[in-house]
Amino acid sequence: KARRSLLNAVQLSAYGIATPEPIGYAEERSALGGLEDSYYVTRYLTFTGADLQYEARSGEVNESLTRALATFLAELHECGIVHEDLSPGNIPYIYDRAKEEYTFMLVDLNRMHFTATPPSLRASIRNLDRLFAHPRATEALGRAYAEARGWEPAVVQPALEAACDSFWLHRLPKLALRYAQRAEGMSAPTFLRHYNAYLRWRRLRHLCPVGSWQRALHARESAFYTRYLEVEDVRRALAKRENYPHTPLS
């Protein structure tokens, strides 16, 4: 991983994409020569904006930041650069207040690849699905990214919304497990037993005709959702899909 990160950093620099300056890498090997650990070393940088974690989860859209980010992402894709873990923490930035300019960087470089041609619309959208969680932030990013790529916002925005819903729904069980462990001290086997029961109720409800059984199952699901899933259903995608009562996003 460390060697791959260094080589990717060198290639990014050749494209003019900012990343902390690589210094080298080190590997720890066993007596038999097997790789046990590796370390990638870069020059230390202070980031005035840190990363995009706040923007990712909050509904407060910074238009200038979003436009600058979308332009940066479009440039990456136009160059055929695909970072496979394009999460908020992996795009730190520096903000120059005097010039009112953002400089974005890429970190955690071991999972990325370079292509001879820009990724397709579908591949580009999938590459952005984990970046922003809040629907308002996703909408703003989709609009700005479409404009930067010369695509129709009316096509890009709903595609990005659907991709983000799918990504966060896929992550929801793992996030909910962590929440149950943190909030209630619940063990993983206990949570999984409850979660599997919830899935059975949901499948049965989908098979049931409209009636008292369906209402009873939906009530059970809703109670489980409120207790364990809602806090991590960051886009309320599951609540909307299954029609669960929920607290609207702020």
What role is predicted for each listed range?
Residues 86-96:
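Hydrophobic residue at the +6 position relative to the catalytic HRD Asp in the kinase catalytic loop
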Residues 50-59:
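AlphaC helix of the protein kinase catalytic domain
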